[in-house]
């Protein structure tokens, strides 16, 4: 794929089986200032995909993006640190309020990673943010595991149904 809007690129990554697109996406995202904390233990975590969706796609697009970012920033990536405590329906057609309810308590830190997360600056990676409900639910789990701080990076921003254009 050459050119294309951010939305087209994300759609190709997620739904057309083009994980290699994570490379140029990570190149763009890696230029962001202020994400890494100098002197802190920085680590990247990806938003876990529902098992059925990952089986269907063959990969987790957020994990692929996180791995590419980790290589550029030269920090650890813990793509299996966060897990879904339950499967959640797709959020594409949900309102902001429905999204909050949909992902509430849907994530936790895998026990093997809790000690590593304690006191660390964790950077959550996802392909797109819409309302922030998923990011907030993941951050809640990361703070519960003892993270010192949590930041997030995404490649794109989407509008939720009913959002006014900006």
Residue locations for each model-derived region?
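Extended interfacial segments that mediate partner engagement and assembly in macromolecular machines
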Residues: 1-72, 92
